[in-house]
Amino acid sequence: MSSKEQKTPNEQVSEEMENAAEQQVEATQETGEGVDPRVAELEAQLAAAVQRERESLLRAKAEVENIRRRTEQDVEKAHKFALEKFSAELLPVIDNLERALDTADKTNAELAAMIEGVELTLKSLLDAVGKYGIQVVSETNVPFNPEVHQAMTMLESADHEPNHVMMVMQKGYTLNGRLLRPAMVAVSKAKA
C-alpha cells in the first residue's frame, strides 16, 4: 500500500486543501497580479478551515490514545484482581485451619503428628496464596487504620497508645494492596 492509501480521510482532505491553497498562492505570486479582496478572504477562510481540521485531527488522535491507555489499565487491573473472588472463598479455609491449631491439645502425644500435618498444610496454603499477592493483616501495636481494620471494641489500656490495635480477633487479608477482608480488632483508648 502506498502512503496515501494509509492516511485517514481527514488527513487526505487536509493535505489536499493545503496543496490547493499553496498552488493558488504560487499562481497569484507568479502572475504578479494584485490580490483581489475576495481571493484574500477565500484564502483566509481556507487557512482557517485547514487549522480547524488540524486541531480536529489532533483531538481525535489524543482521544484514541486516551482510550488505548484506559483499555490497557483495565486489562492490567483485570489480570491483577482476577483471583479476588476465589481468594475471598479461601479465607474461611485458612481461618478453620488456624482455629483447629488453636484448639488442638498440643500436650497429647497421639495428636502431635496430626497437629504437625495441619501446621504444614496451613503453611503451604499461606505460601501458595502469598505467591499470588495475598497478604495477612494481623499486626498489633500499630495505629488503627480504618482502611484495613474493623474496630470491634475499644478498651482502656495503659500499656498501649490510644487508637492502636491491641488485639486481633480475626485476621484480615489484602490482594495486591486491595482489601479482601478487614482485620477485626480491639482498639486501645486512654484511661478515663
Swiss-Prot record:
GO terms for cellular component: cytosol. Residues 21-31 have a biased composition (Polar residues). The keyword Chaperone applies. Residues 1-34 are annotated as: Disordered. PANTHER family: GRPE PROTEIN (PTHR21237), GRPE PROTEIN HOMOLOG, MITOCHONDRIAL (PTHR21237:SF23). HAMAP family: GrpE (MF_01151). This is Protein GrpE. It comes from Yersinia enterocolitica serotype O:8 / biotype 1B (strain NCTC 13174 / 8081). The lineage of its organism: Bacteria, Pseudomonadati, Pseudomonadota, Gammaproteobacteria, Enterobacterales. The gene is grpE.
